[in-house]
Amino acid sequence: MAIRIVGVDLPQNKRGEIALTYIYGIGRSAAKSVLDKAGVDRDIKVKDWTDDQAAKVREVIGAEYKVEGDLRSEVQLNIKRLMDIGCYRGVRHRVGLPLRGQSTKNNARTRKGKKKTVANKKKATK
């Protein structure tokens, strides 16, 4: 039986600490603190959790963390706000360039996308 927490099926064969990181918004340290607060051993695999342990983990995540859809929408709203106020970071988001001061003369291919070839200008004859 798969354990579903906030709409995500946790992998059965992984330890609880690792399995919780499949939830958007929960990393390794958050997963450790969730399991500690819920009183679940970190090293137990998800398939060995009891229904009571799964319910406790669900309860802790629901009460203390903003995850999945809520977090995604908050991040999107933050980016939209930056673009609306027209600050530097918002402008860089809008034109699809790096935000944090990286040089774009040679690299930044991930952010800029695939190369666009520009036709060569014919050299002027002397």
From Swiss-Prot:
One GO term in the molecular function aspect is: structural constituent of ribosome
GO cellular component: a single term: small ribosomal subunit
Query: What superkingdom heads the lineage?
Result: Bacteria
Keyword set includes Ribosomal protein: yes
SUPFAM superfamilies to which the protein is assigned, alphabetical: S13-like H2TH domain
Query: Which residue stretches belong to region Disordered?
Result: 98-126
Q: Which InterPro entries match?
A: Rbsml_uS13_C, Ribosomal_uS13, Ribosomal_uS13-like_H2TH, Ribosomal_uS13_bac-type, Ribosomal_uS13_CS
Which PROSITE patterns does the UniProt record give? RIBOSOMAL_S13_1, RIBOSOMAL_S13_2
Q: Is Iron among the key words of this record?
A: no
What keywords appear on the UniProt entry? Ribonucleoprotein, Ribosomal protein, RNA-binding, rRNA-binding, tRNA-binding
A GO BP term, please?
translation
Residue stretches of biased makeup (Basic residues): 108-126
Show the HAMAP family listed in the entry: Ribosomal_uS13 (MF_01315)
Family the entry assigns = Belongs to the universal ribosomal protein uS13 family.
- Its biological function? Located at the top of the head of the 30S subunit, it contacts several helices of the 16S rRNA. In the 70S ribosome it contacts the 23S rRNA (bridge B1a) and protein L5 of the 50S subunit (bridge B1b), connecting the 2 subunits; these bridges are implicated in subunit movement. Contacts the tRNAs in the A and P-sites.
Quaternary organization: Part of the 30S ribosomal subunit. Forms a loose heterodimer with protein S19. Forms two bridges to the 50S subunit in the 70S ribosome.
Name by which UniProt lists this protein: Small ribosomal subunit protein uS13
Species assigned in the record: Parabacteroides distasonis (strain ATCC 8503 / DSM 20701 / CIP 104284 / JCM 5825 / NCTC 11152)
The gene coding this protein? rpsM
